[in-house]
């Protein structure tokens, strides 16, 4: 019988010898790369690597794409950060755009600047940062309100303080005189909503306590009577309100107390108002009626109605 030929035993090339072989191959590759370069080329490459420097470059203003992005409501990135009360993000944006007045004073579809929104969302620290960065406090929204108008309407004393303290004197006097599209000054709005502390502050800063509404001539004192607010009446009198100032129809604040429930207001104003401004003036309608009566006379044969019918029968007068 034939026997199968024995196969030669195969020895696995594993272990230390295999690792040495791989290292030797890698060394050969590195050596071959170095050997292919001349000494002058190698020195030049090292020199160039040593001369490489990374220098930060300032990105030119206006090239930031996030400044150009607007929502369908016309809100910029800064508007949105303020609306969502992301204070850290808002402060960082303000820091980056400081001095960029076009971006800081950009108005959305409701003509609101970031400063308007900071007041609306009751964030006085953001309002202060915006003013410091260059935001204009005199810009108006679609209702003609400056940021100070909104702060007075909302009764936020902190925002009022920031806006009045951060404004220069000419700016402040201009804002205090400004009326919105309803004819109201900041003092009028504070009076209408009964914020006595803000009223006192505005008057101390130079607001005209006797400023009249353009539409009908009411002063803050007239408004206080209309609202039946005796505490506001007392404060305005203390601040120098003129009790004898009349509206464009000729009514003094005291005359507006007739038919109103507060006797306290009537007593306060009655002691100070001129006597001829205490009685209600005769209306034009009554005068015209009296005038017509004088000239309208009928004889016995000329009655104003001669065709009266009752139950189908004509009445004989």
UniProtKB/Swiss-Prot annotation:
Phosphorylated at Ser-32 and Ser-36 by IKKA/CHUK and IKKB/IKBKB; disables inhibition of NF-kappa-B DNA-binding activity. Phosphorylation at positions 32 and 36 is prerequisite to recognition by the SCF(FBXW11) and SCF(BTRC) complexes, leading to polyubiquitination and subsequent degradation. Phosphorylated at Ser-32 in response to FK506 treatment: phosphorylation is independent of IKKA/CHUK and IKKB/IKBKB and promotes NFKBIA degradation, followed by NF-kappa-B activation. Phosphorylated at Tyr-42: its effect is however unclear. Polyubiquitinated at Lys-21 and/or Lys-22 following phosphorylation at Ser-32 and Ser-36. Monoubiquitinated at Lys-21 and/or Lys-22 by UBE2D3. Ubiquitin chain elongation is then performed by CDC34 in cooperation with the SCF(FBXW11) E3 ligase complex, building ubiquitin chains from the UBE2D3-primed NFKBIA-linked ubiquitin. The resulting polyubiquitination leads to protein degradation. Also ubiquitinated by the SCF(BTRC) complex following stimulus-dependent phosphorylation at Ser-32 and Ser-36. Deubiquitinated by USP38, leading to NF-kappa-B inhibition. The gene is NFKBIA. Residues 1-39 are annotated as: Disordered. The modification Phosphothreonine is found at residues 291, 299. A motif (Nuclear import signal) lies at residues 110-120. Pfam families: Ank_2, Ank_5. This is NF-kappa-B inhibitor alpha. GO terms for cellular component: cytoplasm; cytosol; I-kappaB/NF-kappaB complex; nucleoplasm; nucleus; plasma membrane. Induction: Induced in adherent monocytes.
